[in-house]
Regions:
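Repeated loop/turn-to-beta-strand initiation elements of outer-membrane beta-barrel proteins
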Residues: 194-195, 221-223, 250-257, 281-287, ...
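Predominantly transmembrane beta-strands of Gram-negative outer membrane beta-barrel pores used
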Residues: 224-265, 270-294, 306-308, 503
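Gram-negative outer-membrane beta-barrel proteins
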Residues: 174, 221, 231-235, 249-251, ...
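Periplasmic polypeptide-binding modules associated with outer-membrane biogenesis and secretion
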Residues: 20-231, 242-244, 258-268, 272-274, ...
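Transmembrane beta-strand segments of outer-membrane beta-barrel domains in Gram-negative
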Residues: 286-428
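Bacterial Sec-dependent N-terminal signal peptides
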Residues: 1-23, 542
Length: 542
């Protein structure tokens, strides 16, 4: 009888393959009326019959077939069935009850698919009845174990192999895992350097399994120019600027090359150059080299160099160790008064750091989430000018801690809040610092409403809150407020700063246009709109 049942099903499906796709009309036999009533329609006969059996119609039979009309006798709907225990379940009893066989079958199929058996099949074998309840046995045929034998790139064939292995976590020879492969698209979307033309596909051959990826290299280089208007310490009108250049994935190694130049209203100049290579020799080890130069007018010049080796935990985060070399030279040797505040020194140190970043799908947004934590141990050798003797050599130990984090929250469609916290501290036993080793904050990138790098401190903290109304992906207007505290042991200053302002950002053919207006105050001063700062710039992608 069962053999005849499958013959009928096969015959019906064969007819459908050569004809126009039609819907089957299923009629159910009613024991009370002794007649058939129309039950439902479906285009796939076999899947319909399988579904009915899975939900509990285990005695289902086909009474007759007339064209597209299928006359069924569903039989009894078994709410509870007893499944025979075997190596698949490993329970204590010979049989165990269930009222959701479909979920069991789905779970078994999913587990095997993610363990290298994508073609695993489960056979339901009836084992009779007990107390009017169905007893069955599930027999699992796993098939052959599948492993990833190769990755084929279609489109961007020079995609870095280290990124494939450690960024996308695809390793040749690993066991096939469908759940893991389904996350590849979301992983690709976490970088700005590539896009996905279509979803990954898997080619199953008799003796091999090949994964096909469809990446596309995108333009990800940036030029960002910001021009600021304000006044210097004498109240005179001054221009200041900030130029950023970012070259990304130029050599197809997912590398980042950045240059940042800042010129302030007080004739200070800083240059920051960095090179980041995330997958050295196709490994999960990366390198980040940083060179910084700061010159305060003609008074002194600082040079900082650091080399950071990091381990890529995943696409979003890494942990690293750094080597640090710093030096500073006082340029006005004939100025004895200034020489007491500025020391020649050299520093060497090591540090630990952790970095986490998740991009936001909107191009206007800096990112969705960011966290950077660092701890450095530094040994400083300095040459101090003394009124009693010309040079006084001194060696001290210092510790540096830093934190910067932000998070973008979507309060409601089109309404976003960005919260930012930044902290940095340079610590030493005697709290004795040189003027030329202090942090310099202020301006568009830190606390808005003040001149670029016009505030010095050995410890500071900044908390910012931005509200943004984003009607579409290409435009937003916002309000912001910044609060900061500074501690300057050198000048014996401990105070707080406050600023607020508004800004606008939108996409143009040239790039992203930014315009902001901010005004700030200290504990000793009030808001003076004559001292307000205006910044505008264009972030161009090429």
């Amino acid at each position: 009888m069962r053999f005849l049942f499958y013959i009928i099903v096969f015959f019906l499906q064969s007819i459908c393959l050569f004809g126009q796709e039609k819907s089957f009309h299923f009629f159910r036999y009613n024991d009370e009326t002794k007649s058939y009533t129309k039950d439902f329609e479906h285009k796939n006969l076999q899947s319909t019959l399988d579904s009915l059996q899975k939900i509990g119609y285990y005695t289902l039979t086909i009474d007759s077939i007339k064209n597209e009309n299928i006359y069924l006798n569903k039989g009894k709907l078994y709410q509870t069935i007893w499944v025979k225990n075997n190596e698949t379940f490993q329970t204590k009893n010979d049989y165990f009850p269930t009222n959701n066989l479909d979920s069991i079958l789905t779970k078994i199929s999913t587990e095997n698919t993610n363990q290298g058996y994508p073609f695993a099949q489960i056979k339901i074998i009836p084992k009779g009845f007990e107390n009017n309840e169905q007893k069955i046995e599930l027999v699992l045929d796993k098939g052959n174990l599948r492993t990833i034998d190769g990755v084929k790139l279609v489109g961007y064939e020079k995609l870095d192999k280290g990124y494939i292995k450690h960024g996308l976590n695809i390793k040749r020879g690993e066991i096939y895992n469908e759940e893991k492969l389904s996350n590849i698209s979301s992983l690709m979307n976490q970088t700005n350097f590539i896009s996905e033309v279509q979803k990954p596909q898997t080619l199953f051959r008799k003796d091999s399994t090949i994964l096909y990826l469809y990446p596309e290299k995108v333009r990800s280089n940036y030029f960002d120019g910001v021009l600021g208007f304000g006044t210097d310490d004498n109240g005179d009108f001054r221009l200041n600027g900030n130029v950023k250049l970012s070259l990304n994935n130029v050599f197809n190694g997912m590398e980042e090359i950045r240059l940042n130049w800042i010129g302030t209203a007080n004739k200070n100049t800083s240059l920051d150059i960095g090179v980041k290579i995330p997958y050295l020799f196709k490994s999960a080890i990366g390198s980040e080299t940083t060179f910084k130069l700061f010159k305060q007018d003609s008074v002194f010049v600082n040079i900082n160099f650091s080399e950071r080796l990091f381990y890529q935990l995943n696409l979003s985060s890494n942990i690293g160790v750094s080597g640090i070399v710093q030096s500073s030279n006082f340029l006005l040797d004939d100025d004895s008064f200034l020489k007491t505040s500025y020391d020649d020194y050299s520093k060497i140190g090591v540090g630990l750091s952790y970095n986490y970043f998740v991009k936001h799908p909107f191009r206007l947004m800096e990112g969705k989430s960011y966290l950077n934590v660092l701890v450095n141990s530094i040994r400083k050798k300095e040459k101090n000018f003394s009124w009693t003797e010309d040079i006084e050599n001194k060696t001290v130990n210092q510790y540096e801690i830093g934190l910067k984090t932000y998070r973008l929250f979507e309060l409601h469609p089109k309404h976003f809040i960005k919260g930012t916290v930044e902290f940095a501290g340079l610590l030493t036993k005697d709290d004795d610092f040189s003027e030329n080793e202090l942090y310099r904050i202020g301006g568009f990138g830190s606390i808005r409403g003040f001149n670029e790098e016009s505030i010095t401190a050995n410890m500071y903290g900044i908390a910012s809150m931005d509200y943004r109304f984003v009607p579409n992906e290409a435009f937003y207007i916002g309000l912001f407020a910044d609060y900061a505290f500074i501690d300057n042991k050198r000048a014996n200053i401990n105070t707080s700063l406050l600023s607020f302002g508004t800004g606008i950002s939108f996409l143009t053919k040239m790039g992203i246009f930014n315009l902001s207006y901010a005004v700030g105050k200290t504990e000793e001063t009030s808001f003076d709109f004559k001292e307000s700062k205006i910044h505008f710039g264009i972030l161009s992608q090429f």
